[in-house]
């Protein structure tokens, strides 16, 4: 539940930021610092290998991944792309169904060892999950940011998985944004 005052909101947000859970592909827990460091390392390895960072999210999460793309390209020099260009997104949604809007471009553009990052408050969106499965099949490395339910599907599909223990969009999306800012700023040096 959203708090009544801004101070209460910030106190709850601060507690949540420090409670973010990180797991690896096998579900083993990592510290938040270790997860963030591994993410930054993966971003820099992607740059050094001339690979791509591919990003996907819906709604507010789409805005977050667009911002991450901007920061990776401009500040870090990483080749990064999002799959939210309206003509392609609406064509795929209309012709193939909304569940395909991330899977289809992953199948077209992703290559082995690219890095696929998803941001999803629920971690359950069909199009995100299908994109994650396609990325795994292509041999991509995968990072997920999710919230709401600790057993969400996205969290089972990443090499690194960041989970915000809240079911309030405002907290989950703000935490995802903070994670993204830290990681892209650190990667930029």
Q: Where is each model-derived feature located?
A:
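Conserved N-terminal alpha-helical segment that immediately precedes and caps sugar-phosphate-binding
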Residues: 1-189
């Amino acid at each position: 539940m959203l708090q009544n005052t801004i101070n209460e909101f910030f106190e709850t947000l601060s507690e949540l930021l420090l409670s973010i859970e990180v797991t690896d592909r096998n579900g083993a827990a990592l510290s938040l610092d270790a997860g963030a460091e591994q993410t930054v390392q993966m971003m820099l390895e992607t740059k050094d290998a001339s690979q791509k960072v591919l990003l996907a999210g819906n709604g507010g999460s789409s805005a977050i991944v667009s911002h991450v793309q901007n920061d990776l390209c401009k500040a870090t020099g990483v080749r990064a792309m999002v799959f939210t260009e309206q003509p392609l997104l609406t064509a795929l949604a209309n012709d193939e169904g909304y569940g395909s809007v991330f899977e289809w471009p992953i199948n077209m553009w992703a290559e082995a060892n690219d890095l696929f990052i998803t941001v999803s408050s629920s971690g359950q969106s069909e199009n995100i999950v299908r994109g994650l499965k396609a990325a795994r099949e292509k041999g991509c490395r995968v990072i997920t940011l999710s919230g709401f339910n600790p057993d969400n599907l996205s969290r089972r599909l990443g090499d690194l998985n960041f989970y915000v223990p809240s079911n309030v969009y405002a907290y989950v999306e703000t935490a995802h944004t903070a994670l993204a800012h830290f990681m892209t700023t650190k990667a930029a040096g």
